[in-house]
Amino acid sequence: MENMLLWLIFFTPGWTLIDGSEMEWDFMWHLRKVPRIVSERTFHLTSPAFEADAKMMVNTVCGIECQKELPTPSLSELEDYLSYETVFENGTRTLTRVKVQDLVLEPTQNITTKGVSVRRKRQVYGTDSRFSILDKRFLTNFPFSTAVKLSTGCSGILISPQHVLTAAHCVHDGKDYVKGSKKLRVGLLKMRNKSGGKKRRGSKRSRREASGGDQREGTREHLRERAKGGRRRKKSGRGQRIAEGRPSFQWTRVKNTHIPKGWARGGMGDATLDYDYALLELKRAHKKKYMELGISPTIKKMPGGMIHFSGFDNDRADQLVYRFCSVSDESNDLLYQYCDAESGSTGSGVYLRLKDPDKKNWKRKIIAVYSGHQWVDVHGVQKDYNVAVRITPLKYAQICLWIHGNDANCAYG
């Protein structure tokens, strides 16, 4: 049943009917020239305290409805939000100021678009539509193999051989870095092998025999000890066979973390939900296939208005959970959606599958970061939504700068 469902999810053609009419047939990735973000100057800051409590929800934030009433940010404001902090594994911290070039400010910055009308409820809506990925044929292969788990309790996604994209609130509460983020680790799923990761015992014996053998060789006591050792090995072997085939995590330390100043405000105001994303650089590269970053299209350019993401929901211990759902509302920076999700899945990479215009095949790219279940200000009233932070051209340029260290490879996205 699971295999049939996943086949339908991943191989259904990219057309659908919504509200009785066919959506626009332009489901392709369109490369566009993006603004340049250039590092201007880097300052050393005092080391953070690492004392904040990890939060799965942000306190009251300005959501889509609230954004409609805001003026378009000026260039200097955007440069302030896109400047970024870097915290290193030894606890040191820097602030990098940036300049934005080749940006055309549009007067319709905060226009919003309605998607499919959906009944609003909390994190899980009626019948739970999440799917635990248990079959190792899917679990260890793309796209599911790109999902990772953070030691702070969130999820993330591989976007390069050495980088993970996640939500900023998973490592920083807007004022300070969360407890445990100084020694942050990322867990990559792998399958246990037959030996359980232990070395064979025969090597020690062969070395002993090569050096002249054991003085007790041939005695009754020695034979009895060898028999007991054999029984112990048989018992441990049974335990290894039980563990064989189950997924486990291979944990890797994080070398440094980048967070935009739009989120890491310190004492200079509240964190902005639009900038709830962070990039983690791993100490060592992985060998898995990663998912490329893309720029979020409008709802009309999403097949069926649907998005997909996988993460490690807390109510399903160490299971990778996949879901897909419709986007209900969008602004330039946020997506409201009603995917069933629990805490632990925040930080997951939200992706689409569109046509690659050059190769004419379908390709998945990350177009948002799942920020989680958030309380937002709607005309002075607090309402709860599931929110994802969109990858805009500016954010694409910033994350690309973080990955490559310069903007040479970030002209198009």
UniProtKB/Swiss-Prot annotation:
Domain Peptidase S1: 124-408
Signal peptide start and end residues: 1-16
Biased composition (Basic and acidic residues): 208-228
Compartment(s) of residence: Secreted
Composition-biased stretches (Basic residues): 191-207, 229-238
Keyword Secreted: yes
Alphabetic keyword roster: Disulfide bond, Glycoprotein, Secreted, Serine protease homolog, Signal
Disulfide bonds: 154-170
Glycosylation sites (chain numbering): 90
Predominant subcellular localization, coarse grouping: secreted
Domain of life: Eukaryota
GO cellular component, one term: extracellular region
Region span, Disordered: 191-250
Membership in a protein family: Belongs to the peptidase S1 family.
Protein name: Inactive serine protease 35
Organism the protein comes from: Homo sapiens
